[in-house]
C-alpha cells in the first residue's frame, strides 16, 4: 500500500473514530470543498469539527487510487439526510497530509 493511501485512509479513520486531532495533517494544511478553502491545520479543525458533528454520521471507503504523493479516495458520507457520494484528492509530503480537495454535492448539508 502506498504511503499516500495509508494517509488517505487515516483521514477517514480519524473522523470515524471521532479523533480528528490524530489525523496527520501538516501545520500548513489546506482544505478545499464546496464550502470554500481553509488554510492552516488548527483553523481547519476549529472550523470543520462543528460541521462534522451536525452533518456526518459515518464515512465508508469505497475505493482508493494512489501514487507516491497523491491519493484519490472515494467514499460514502452518511448524513442525517441520507448518503452523499464523495471523493477527496489527498496530497502528502514528508509523511503528512498537506492538502485535500473534496468533491461532493453539499445541497443537503448545513454550514
Which residues does each PLM region occupy?
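C-terminal and inter-domain tail/linker signature
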Residues: 1-111
